[in-house]
């Protein structure tokens, strides 16, 4: 549906606008950062803002994780003929994707700078801007 509605075209406008930002910016993810939407909000790269952090509730991925599993593991899922085993495999793969997409994992792999306590958000933003 989103392809028929031209979502990517509209999202490209956000990407271009974000990439043209010349002032320093800080990105704080409260919940989910998936696909082009996340990229648009950080100027095209998680490394473009002067500081990128997430609350512990943050989730990250190149696209929605359920869809990513269906596309990325299509052969494995189609090869399983037993419906119950197929569902179990799918659920296991989705769970693994959620584990890999947690904010703490993104920070551990240097995709973001830190996972912060939500109550420290204002202090973290001010420190990042002052440090610029």
Annotate each language-model stretch with its function:
Residues 1-132:
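Ligand-binding clefts of soluble mixed alpha/beta catalytic domains
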């Amino acid at each position: 549906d989103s392809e028929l509605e031209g979502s990517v075209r509209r999202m490209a406008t956000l990407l271009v606008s974000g990439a043209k930002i010349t002032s320093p910016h800080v990105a704080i993810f409260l919940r989910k950062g998936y696909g082009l939407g996340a990229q648009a909000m950080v100027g095209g790269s998680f490394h473009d803002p002067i500081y990128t952090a997430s609350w512990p509730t943050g989730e990250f991925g190149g696209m929605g994780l359920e869809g990513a599993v269906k596309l990325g593991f299509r052969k494995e899922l189609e090869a399983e003929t037993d419906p119950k085993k197929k569902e179990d495999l799918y659920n296991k793969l989705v769970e693994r994707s959620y584990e890999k997409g947690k904010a703490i994992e993104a920070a551990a792999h240097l995709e973001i700078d830190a996972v912060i306590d939500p109550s420290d958000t204002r202090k973290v933003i001010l420190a990042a801007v002052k440090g610029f």
